[in-house]
Amino acid sequence: SFYITGVSGVGKSSVSEMLEKKGISSFDIDSVKDLCHWINKETLEKSNWHSGLGNEWHEAHEWICDKEKLIHLINQYKDLVVVVGCASNQDEYLDLFDKVFLLHCIPETFIKRIDNRTNNDFGKHGIEKARILNWYKGFESKLIKQGAIPINTEEPLVLVVEKIIRNIKN
């Protein structure tokens, strides 16, 4: 199995949809009911996020993926599966995957995509945007150091997906 990650707006959902159209099983961790949730970092209690929450709330919470549920989901696929997403605790489950791909693009592009997307409200509010902009460089360089394969999503979607498929088959 393979994992595709990257900050909000780099094209993870679009890549997942196109992989599905090409007959490659894929799912977005944000789209699977109860797989991911916000938790309070101190109390570990589940929390509800909505657009427009302040910086204080975001400092105290993180988006996490349930590793056991993820393993169970991956094991339901007989052939390869491509999982896409980004969670605060993804370091805990990256070792489940044969390869990890890091989608990246310039900030102007991912901000424009966030503003224009209709499938996810995260990042539309100023505070969320600022957090993504403060966070993405460190996030990306850390993943590359961990061996993620960088894929530039400034290119047309079809070329991005072709590159990923080539890397999966090698």
What are these regions (language model features)?
Residues V7:
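P-loop (Walker A) phosphate-binding loop of NTP-binding proteins
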